[in-house]
Amino acid sequence: MAGPPALPPPETAAAATTAAAASSSAASPHYQEWILDTIDSLRSRKARPDLERICRMVRRRHGPEPERTRAELEKLIQQRAVLRVSYKGSISYRNAARVQPPRRGATPPAPPRAPRGAPAAAAAAAPPPTPAPPPPPAPVAAAAPARAPRAAAAAATAPPSPGPAQPGPRAQRAAPLAAPPPAPAAPPAVAPPAGPRRAPPPAVAAREPPLPPPPQPPAPPQQQQPPPPQPQPPPEGGAVRAGGAARPVSLREVVRYLGGSGGAGGRLTRGRVQGLLEEEAAARGRLERTRLGALALPRGDRPGRAPPAASARPSRSKRGGEERVLEKEEEEDDDEDEDEEDDVSEGSEVPESDRPAGAQHHQLNGERGPQSAKERVKEWTPCGPHQGQDEGRGPAPGSGTRQVFSMAAMNKEGGTASVATGPDSPSPVPLPPGKPALPGADGTPFGCPPGRKEKPSDPVEWTVMDVVEYFTEAGFPEQATAFQEQEIDGKSLLLMQRTDVLTGLSIRLGPALKIYEHHIKVLQQGHFEDDDPDGFLG
């Protein structure tokens, strides 16, 4: 049949559902598997698994009629293996095993897809645990021997002989659990089983009230003993639901165990628990605060090692952490001082006769990186004839051909300083006539009258702004900014190939072709006779 299968009216569906429910109370494993797989595949394709889609897909894949699929789906809903969800007036279905666990309790019980291959009786027995209601069923309550009140009573009445056996494994578990602080969200996931987790604190507390005695190995549990007895009286439904087997610890229990208010003031989030865990670890010296306020593992500490003594350890590691932080700060301050000295010594005076033009350009534009804002302001403010004296970097007497470079010209994008010698900048000895000066990347110092020199005839010596000016004069002002953003100076321009212009500059293809052709014409006019015109400029 070409169209989608005609679904029966609700009355017929209800009758079919009740008849099927009367005949067999549990859905057959085949149908359960088919329906759950269909729901999962629809959700994975972001399609809403409503009744019509589920019936159509089950029929296409496996062949049963929509009425039968509906009946089986109703059974699965009764078994709580499938959840019916109403969203914006339309009803869809979800696989209960993939739904997030309820927020208040621990993780949900075993997923309901387990009885897939099991007989119908096992499937029928599965329903009660899944909804996770606060009042637990009687058999589950009976099967939970580790309930908090019973544990407290047992701890109060128990003789001290079984006591030492309990804290041993717990201490071994708790030490690695508290030791690696970078994963504070781990306690809920890596939780020990419910029995030994809840029972020992009162037993240990009742057995050894004084904290100091060193022979006791479990240092972390002892330090945290006073808070745990508080949560014992009010048992939560979540504590009972797990049936006494391994139950992950809820965030609320972790907060109470660390002595915080158990989420009384608003929602309990992982962030709050993480903050409590970090504070606890920092207070006990397992973490140290950096200068920026973050928490980091002390350098000497390894996560696996247990602390030697309970009382001596926190104060010692706290002191050690402060000393380490102080040492770090001193080292960083020393490094900064050295960097500043290097900046001044490198940028102060440049013997021009010893350096080629490229080296002059890179001396301040290269590896040193942008300078601090204070230094930039100092270097920008002076202009006019007193520039060298105001900067405090005037030439030494008898310095021969040394020349003072103004640091005023700053490249707008990069923020790095480039060497500039305008006609304003004083030079004790006049420049050699044949040596062209490098114009500043931006032209003139801020607030100073424009006194740029003309663009050098040799493009090797062009700066970024010379290249921008060249293309602006050629009639491509918008595209010239692309050359400025990429910081293409004369040398880079000479090395560019055709593909670099067309694809590497984020210029649209039409203008890029025009720019390239304009430049080829310039080449043909004999601007650069010696260069090979295959490249962009050579």
Swiss-Prot record:
Residues 328-351 have a biased composition (Acidic residues). SUPFAM superfamilies: SAM/Pointed domain. GO terms for molecular function: chromatin binding; DNA binding; low-density lipoprotein particle binding. One of its GO terms (cellular component) is nucleus. Expressed in atherosclerotic lesions, not in normal intima. Expressed in foam cells. Residues 1-30, 92-247, 282-458 are annotated as: Disordered. Residues 282-291 have a biased composition (Basic and acidic residues). Changing R94A: Decreases binding to unmethylated CpG islands. Induction: Expression is inhibited by miRNA MIR378C. InterPro entries: SAM, SAM/pointed_sf, SAMD1-like_SHD, SAMD1-like_WH. Residues 462-530 form the SAM domain. Keywords: Chromatin regulator, Chromosome, Nucleus, Phosphoprotein, Secreted. Residues 23-99 form the SAMD1-like winged helix (WH) domain. The modification Phosphothreonine is found at T107. It comes from the Eukaryota. Winged-helix (WH) domain directly recognizes and binds unmethylated CpG-containing DNA via simultaneous interactions with both the major and the minor groove of DNA. Unmethylated CpG islands (CGIs)-binding protein which localizes to H3K4me3-decorated CGIs, where it acts as a transcriptional repressor. Tethers L3MBTL3 to chromatin and interacts with the KDM1A histone demethylase complex to modulate H3K4me2 and H3K4me3 levels at CGIs. Plays a role in atherogenesis by binding with LDL on cell surface and promoting LDL oxidation which leads to the formation of foam cell. This is Sterile alpha motif domain-containing protein 1. It comes from Homo sapiens. The lineage of its organism: Eukaryota, Metazoa, Chordata, Craniata, Vertebrata. The gene is SAMD1.
